[in-house]
Amino acid sequence: MRLTNAFFANHAEVVDDMLNVTGGCWTSTTVADGATAFATRCVIFCEVSRQDRGKQFGLHIDAAGPSGQQWTPARSSYFTVPSRIAFMVTPPIALPIEPSGGLHSYTVRLEDHDERITLPLHVQVVAGSAFPSR
């Protein structure tokens, strides 16, 4: 199995083996003052061979904030490849941010594999916002 691309989305799901996305391909997000995480789904594109079917893989998302703070991993999940797939969608997840916002970097990787997909994300903090702190 090999990762080829990834992006954040407000909502993503698989319907009839097709990807349905709302609000995808973020380059920035806005959070309320004091937030330490943001909610998202991550869509991950991959190449799967016959040999990968039935095998278990570990998917990790690492995070780094603008001050150098790192969360490795920030999120991990394990899954078994059921069949030939071209993409995966995470369930709703919360990924960490530094409370002051700024340019963060999220890296999607498979355990014991070299491929990495890096997703830069500018986090804007809004004081007194109606956004819930997640």
Predicted regions and their residues:
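Contiguous segments within soluble domain cores/interaction surfaces
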Residues: R2-R134
